[in-house]
A protein has these predicted regions:
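C-terminal regions of mature proteins
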Residues: 35-60, 253-255, 372-374, 404-504
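M16/MPP (pitrilysin/insulinase) zinc-metallopeptidase core fold and M16-derived inactive scaffolds
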Residues: 92-157, 200, 221-224, 337-353, ...
Length: 504
């Protein structure tokens, strides 16, 4: 069995990658990839020729997507999505489920991820331990899964001539898991081991403190790694409860990408995935709204780190409620991260910050807006003051230009086209967007990005950032904090409420 990667595009490690990544977002396959980190690009200012080419590029990308992405909804509500890519004789078969941290009450905190670990265990068709793994090996398949905030995915990549067998293998795991107590006991220790490894990172405490303050009563619905005690006491009955509510065909999609024929895939899906439609899981258990931040908050976390990391976070738009703002958020983030932008010149080129990154993570149930950066203890106070000054100017008429925006739109369009080249990665990407925003959002993404104007970006920052409550966090070593006598009073824009691991 391939090495399992932990879930969720973890907020935990996102903190580190955001702070240490390069500053300009290069061509990104989607907002999903751009939101988890940045690829260095060093783009130049947009020329008139490039600006005029943008609409044609956007149109070509949408046209290409419509040619290679095929869809059908089965009678039981399962959406089947097929992506043709005949470059190599391989196919990826993936099931995506609208589950993840966002469905978790405190009593189930971390069990969406626990369920992911149990998916490839015994089921009614393969009841013996390791039978699933053995059959997958016979098919020449590699398989894995991941749990994020608003989607869980499971996939096999295998020779295209084993497509039907791979679909049957995933169907039985989806429909009829056994949750054997012996397997659950073993896999629980694996998940606890993942928890221990993450907890040992200096960034774990920092991100966890930020998450508690940003999400407040919704914390369990953003905490994919979960609660140790909930994981330790997991039972087969809790696994079955998750299956009953969320693992129903009308809450799942089947994505097949690679060297396949769409009509053959649809016929196989109709034959194999015939389980009855289930109840709407969100009709019986609706997801509560994330509570608004009542005021600014701040925290200082002491850990053995060699630099100073700063994070500012706001509650951003929900894609289902304010989709237009999500397009503006992505363009705005790209423009701010572009080398040569006003933001980068005043903060990084000035020497106050080693790096600063602006980020919006698209989610249906409130996506976070994050500005993260790295500086030195000696420059921290001045760096924070400079960052505050720039944030206050985000909606100034001359803070960014249409020319700066055009280059970033073009890079997004090119990145989407390039993403089609790798079938397995594209399947994962489609699964994320299907669950979080709907496939129609993804299909129209490049067009909507291309239509954004400076006024729309300014409206976004006024609605969600400038003058809005935020959470500010500083990660610093105990020695550096003592040396510079850092207190929450130094985070001057925040209403001082707490300090983790040190004195006020």
């Amino acid at each position: 069995m391939p090495e399992r990667y932990t879930s969720m595009m973890s907020n935990l490690f996102r903190a580190r990658s955001l702070m240490l990544a390069a500053l300009a977002l290069a061509a990104a396959a989607s907002t999903a990839s751009a939101q988890q980190g940045a690829a260095s690009a060093a783009p130049k200012r947009q020329t008139d020729a490039n600006q005029s080419a943008l609409p044609a590029t956007a149109a070509r990308v949408r046209s290409t997507l419509e040619k290679v992405i095929h869809r059908e909804v089965l009678p039981n509500g399962m959406e089947v999505i097929v992506v043709e890519n005949h470059g190599v004789p391989l196919a990826t078969v993936e099931i995506d489920v609208k589950n993840g941290a966002f469905t978790q009450t405190p009593e189930y905190e971390g069990l969406a991820h626990m369920y992911e670990h149990m998916f490839f265990k015994s089921d009614s068709a393969y009841p013996q331990p390791d039978a699933f793994t053995q059959h997958a090996a016979e098919l020449g398949a590699v398989f894995n899964g991941s749990t994020r905030e608003e989607v869980v995915n499971y996939y096999l990549t295998l020779p295209a001539d084993s497509l039907e067998a791979g679909m049957r293998l995933l169907e039985s795991a989806f429909r009829a898991p056994l949750f054997r107590p012996d397997e659950l006991a073993r896999e629980k220790e694996v998940v606890l081991g993942e928890y221990d490894r993450q907890e040992s990172s200096p960034f774990f405490k920092f991100q966890d403190e930020m998450n508690h303050r940003l999400w407040r009563s919704a914390y369990s619905r953003k905490n994919t790694i979960g609660n140790r005690e909930v994981i330790r006491t997991v039972t087969p009955e809790k696994m079955r409860e998750i299956q009953k509510h969320y693992y129903v065909p009308n809450n799942a999609s089947l994505i097949v990408a690679g060297d396949v024929e769409p009509q053959k895939v649809f016929a196989l899906a109709r034959e194999i995935f015939r389980m009855p439609k289930g109840a709407d899981p969100f009709g019986t258990q609706p997801i509560p709204e994330v509570p608004p931040l009542p005021a600014d908050d701040a925290v200082i976390v002491e850990q053995p780190v060699s630099t100073v990391l700063v994070m500012e976070q706001w509650l951003g738009p929900s894609v289902g409620e304010d989709p237009e703002a999500t397009y503006a958020a992505d363009v705005f983030s790209d423009v701010m991260n572009q080398e040569g932008s006003t933001f980068q010149k005043r903060l990084v080129d000035s020497g106050l910050w080693h790096s600063v990154l602006v980020n919006y993570y698209t989610l249906d149930h409130t996506g976070p807006i994050t500005i993260s950066g790295e500086t030195t203890p000696g420059k921290l106070r001045e760096a924070l003051a400079a960052l505050d000054a720039e944030i206050a100017k985000f909606d100034d008429p001359d803070y960014f230009t249409a020319a700066e925006m055009a280059l970033q739109k073009q890079q997004r369009a090119v990145g989407t086209a390039l993403g089609l080249e790798r079938a397995s990665g594209f399947a994962h990407e489609l699964g994320f967007w299907w669950s979080v925003a709907g496939l129609d959002y993804y299909m129209g993404y490049v067009d909507n990005m291309a239509s954004q104007t400076p006024d729309q970006l300014r409206a976004y920052v006024r609605k969600y950032i400038v003058g809005k409550p935020r959470v500010t966090g500083v990660l610093i070593s105990p020695q550096d904090r003592q040396r510079i006598q850092l207190t929450l009073d130094d985070l001057h824009h925040a209403r001082l409420t707490s300090s983790a691991g040190g004195n006020r």
